Amino acid sequence: MLKASLKSIASYIPEKILSNADLEKMVDTTDEWITRRTGIKERRIASENENTSDLGTKAALKAIKRANLKPEDIDAILVATLSPDYFTMPSTACKIASNLGLVNISAFDISAACSGFIYLLEQAKALVESGLKKNVLIIGAEKTSSIMDYNDRSICILFGDGAGAGVVSLDNENHILDVHTASNGNYGDLLMTQRSQKSNLCQTLSMQMKGNEVFKIAVNTLSNDVVEILAKNNILAQEIDLFIPHQANLRIIKAVQEKLNLSDEKCVITVQKYGNTSAASIPMAMNDAYEEGRLKKGDLILLDAFGGGFTWGSALLKFGGENF
């Protein structure tokens, strides 16, 4: 039976750093409060002339190279983002395909907010294992600064920019074991990007969140989801080599880590230096672990994410990339 594998991981991190000290000068907040409530110390911000597709392209090129492929070997591009270059069309995936010089291939975006990378894995796995595609490029890319209200202290402290990418291809040895995704649209108004009511041209967008409600639901949902996917696959939490969660809030991460009774050595945390990069956070965290030598070929990895929609998901996989 055909098995899909994540054969590479890479990221692109913008140069500009927006620290908590910087935010103290912009809104009524403090470094102490941000750190205590979120665990975030700084986040990266893309330059004005960098679009989401630019961030994604830079991560994609590294991911393709690390998979020992060339751009022309890719036959599908899937992008997860909540901050696309264009409001409706063309898709960010099509822009990245153009940047890579690729035509006549499948390219589309997935809108699943912070859960986007889990959704990408599920779709790429299905495409490869069905035999429809051979090498699927998956990209989580975000320029959240483009939809951020930097006068709203409740949300501007949380988010940053960046991109992560990987290639999913066949590998019957180190493959994606299972992916679970789900949603509940009844909570959609707790975390959303609101269109300005002053214009029907959709020129003004801003992210809005009811943080306390989101926090409670996220902790309960993620804790249950990771327990269920482990049980379904007859895997004990202690068998996991690395737990790489969506990097939204340190308190959420720690709550799920405690539920699984995992040591700090098995939990990858990058929220302190990148903030919440939405669909890019998991591949960015994976890449940090990869380049640090913590993520190695054959390692058993548990991923989880929760985002607007609400959407959520988890994945179990054995990493198929060569060691860094």
From Swiss-Prot:
Q: What class of enzyme is it?
A: transferase
Q: Which UniProt keywords apply?
A: Acyltransferase, Cytoplasm, Fatty acid biosynthesis, Fatty acid metabolism, Lipid biosynthesis, Lipid metabolism, Multifunctional enzyme, Transferase
Q: Where are the transmembrane segments?
A: none
Q: Which family does it belong to?
A: Belongs to the thiolase-like superfamily. FabH family.
Q: Know the name of this protein?
A: Beta-ketoacyl-[acyl-carrier-protein] synthase III
Provide a GO CC annotation, any one: cytoplasm
> Where found, per UniProt?
Cytoplasm
InterPro entries listed in its UniProt record = ACP_syn_III_C, ACP_syn_III_N, FabH, Thiolase-like
Q: Where is the active site?
A: C114, H246, N276
Reported EC number(s) for this entry are: 2.3.1.180
Q: What NCBIfam families is this protein classified in?
A: fabH, PRK09352.1
- Give yes or no: UniProt keyword Cytoplasm: yes
Q: In which pathway does it act?
A: Lipid metabolism; fatty acid biosynthesis
